[in-house]
From Swiss-Prot:
Pfam families: Ribosomal_L12 (PF00542), Ribosomal_L12_N (PF16320). Keywords: Ribonucleoprotein, Ribosomal protein. The gene is rplL. This is Large ribosomal subunit protein bL12. InterPro entries: Ribosomal_bL12, Ribosomal_bL12_C, Ribosomal_bL12_C/ClpS-like, Ribosomal_bL12_oligo, Ribosomal_bL12_oligo_N_sf. GO terms for biological process: translation. Homodimer. Part of the ribosomal stalk of the 50S ribosomal subunit. Forms a multimeric L10(L12)X complex, where L10 forms an elongated spine to which 2 to 4 L12 dimers bind in a sequential fashion. Binds GTP-bound translation factors.
Protein backbone atom coordinates (compact mmCIF):
# COMPACT_ATOMS: atom_id res chain seq x y z
CA UNK A 1 0.00 0.00 0.00
CA UNK A 2 2.90 2.34 0.70
CA UNK A 3 4.16 1.69 -2.84
CA UNK A 4 0.83 2.81 -4.30
CA UNK A 5 0.86 5.95 -2.19
CA UNK A 6 4.36 6.74 -3.48
CA UNK A 7 3.24 6.21 -7.10
CA UNK A 8 0.27 8.54 -6.58
CA UNK A 9 2.56 11.15 -5.03
CA UNK A 10 5.02 10.87 -7.92
CA UNK A 11 2.25 11.14 -10.53
CA UNK A 12 0.78 14.17 -8.76
CA UNK A 13 4.06 16.02 -9.07
CA UNK A 14 4.25 15.60 -12.89
CA UNK A 15 3.79 18.61 -15.15
CA UNK A 16 1.18 18.49 -17.90
CA UNK A 17 3.85 17.80 -20.53
CA UNK A 18 5.35 15.00 -18.45
CA UNK A 19 1.88 13.48 -17.89
CA UNK A 20 1.20 13.57 -21.65
CA UNK A 21 4.54 11.88 -22.33
CA UNK A 22 3.76 9.23 -19.69
CA UNK A 23 0.38 8.59 -21.34
CA UNK A 24 2.06 8.08 -24.73
CA UNK A 25 4.62 5.68 -23.25
CA UNK A 26 1.90 3.66 -21.50
CA UNK A 27 -0.19 3.53 -24.70
CA UNK A 28 2.79 2.12 -26.59
CA UNK A 29 3.73 -0.32 -23.82
CA UNK A 30 0.19 -1.69 -23.34
CA UNK A 31 -1.04 -1.28 -26.93
CA UNK A 32 -4.08 0.82 -25.98
CA UNK A 33 -5.35 4.28 -26.76
CA UNK A 34 -6.30 6.73 -24.00
CA UNK A 35 -8.56 8.63 -26.42
CA UNK A 36 -10.79 5.57 -26.90
CA UNK A 37 -11.12 5.09 -23.16
CA UNK A 38 -12.09 8.73 -22.71
CA UNK A 39 -14.68 8.48 -25.50
CA UNK A 40 -16.23 5.37 -23.95
CA UNK A 41 -16.32 6.95 -20.51
CA UNK A 42 -17.83 10.17 -21.85
CA UNK A 43 -20.44 8.40 -24.00
CA UNK A 44 -23.05 7.67 -21.32
CA UNK A 45 -22.64 11.11 -19.76
CA UNK A 46 -23.22 12.81 -23.10
CA UNK A 47 -26.32 10.68 -23.68
CA UNK A 48 -27.73 11.60 -20.28
CA UNK A 49 -27.16 15.28 -20.99
CA UNK A 50 -28.98 15.02 -24.30
CA UNK A 51 -31.92 13.30 -22.64
CA UNK A 52 -32.20 16.11 -20.10
CA UNK A 53 -32.27 18.70 -22.89
CA UNK A 54 -35.02 16.93 -24.86
CA UNK A 55 -38.43 18.50 -24.54
CA UNK A 56 -40.90 16.53 -22.47
CA UNK A 57 -43.55 14.90 -24.69
CA UNK A 58 -45.89 13.29 -22.16
CA UNK A 59 -47.48 15.19 -19.33
CA UNK A 60 -49.59 14.35 -16.31
CA UNK A 61 -52.35 16.81 -15.47
CA UNK A 62 -52.55 16.95 -11.67
CA UNK A 63 -55.44 18.52 -9.79
CA UNK A 64 -53.65 20.35 -6.96
CA UNK A 65 -56.84 21.63 -5.29
CA UNK A 66 -60.48 22.24 -6.16
CA UNK A 67 -60.53 25.84 -4.99
CA UNK A 68 -63.82 27.50 -4.04
CA UNK A 69 -65.96 26.10 -6.88
CA UNK A 70 -65.80 22.41 -6.04
CA UNK A 71 -69.04 21.51 -7.86
CA UNK A 72 -67.84 23.15 -11.09
CA UNK A 73 -64.52 21.33 -10.81
CA UNK A 74 -66.29 17.99 -10.25
CA UNK A 75 -68.39 18.60 -13.40
CA UNK A 76 -65.26 19.41 -15.40
CA UNK A 77 -63.40 16.34 -14.07
CA UNK A 78 -66.38 14.16 -15.08
CA UNK A 79 -66.37 15.66 -18.57
CA UNK A 80 -62.61 15.13 -18.98
CA UNK A 81 -62.29 11.65 -17.48
CA UNK A 82 -65.69 10.08 -18.10
CA UNK A 83 -65.88 9.10 -14.42
CA UNK A 84 -69.15 8.78 -12.56
CA UNK A 85 -70.28 11.43 -10.10
CA UNK A 86 -68.99 9.62 -6.99
CA UNK A 87 -65.60 8.79 -8.57
CA UNK A 88 -65.14 12.36 -9.81
CA UNK A 89 -66.12 13.74 -6.38
CA UNK A 90 -63.63 11.38 -4.67
CA UNK A 91 -60.88 12.45 -7.08
CA UNK A 92 -61.54 16.16 -6.47
CA UNK A 93 -61.77 15.77 -2.69
CA UNK A 94 -58.61 13.65 -2.64
CA UNK A 95 -56.49 16.31 -4.38
CA UNK A 96 -53.66 16.42 -5.26
CA UNK A 97 -54.45 13.63 -7.72
CA UNK A 98 -53.68 13.03 -11.41
CA UNK A 99 -56.62 13.71 -13.71
CA UNK A 100 -54.96 12.62 -16.97
CA UNK A 101 -51.66 10.82 -17.52
CA UNK A 102 -49.68 10.54 -20.76
CA UNK A 103 -51.26 13.63 -22.32
CA UNK A 104 -49.57 15.54 -25.13
CA UNK A 105 -48.40 19.07 -24.41
CA UNK A 106 -51.33 20.65 -26.27
CA UNK A 107 -53.88 18.36 -24.64
CA UNK A 108 -52.39 18.95 -21.17
CA UNK A 109 -52.47 22.74 -21.65
CA UNK A 110 -56.09 22.54 -22.84
CA UNK A 111 -57.16 20.42 -19.85
CA UNK A 112 -55.30 22.72 -17.47
CA UNK A 113 -57.13 25.74 -18.91
CA UNK A 114 -60.51 23.96 -18.61
CA UNK A 115 -59.94 23.01 -14.98
CA UNK A 116 -58.59 26.44 -14.03
CA UNK A 117 -61.60 28.08 -15.67
CA UNK A 118 -63.80 25.92 -13.41
CA UNK A 119 -61.82 27.21 -10.39
CA UNK A 120 -59.26 24.46 -9.79
CA UNK A 121 -55.54 24.80 -9.20
CA UNK A 122 -53.71 22.54 -11.67
CA UNK A 123 -50.09 21.43 -12.18
CA UNK A 124 -48.47 19.82 -15.20
CA UNK A 125 -45.78 17.24 -14.55
Amino acid sequence: MADLAKIVEDLSSLTVLEAAELAKLLEEKWGVSAAAAVAVAAGPAAGAGAAAVEEQTEFTVVLASAGDKKIEVIKEVRAITGLGLKEAKDLVEGAPKPVKEGATKDEAEKLKAQLEKAGAKVELK
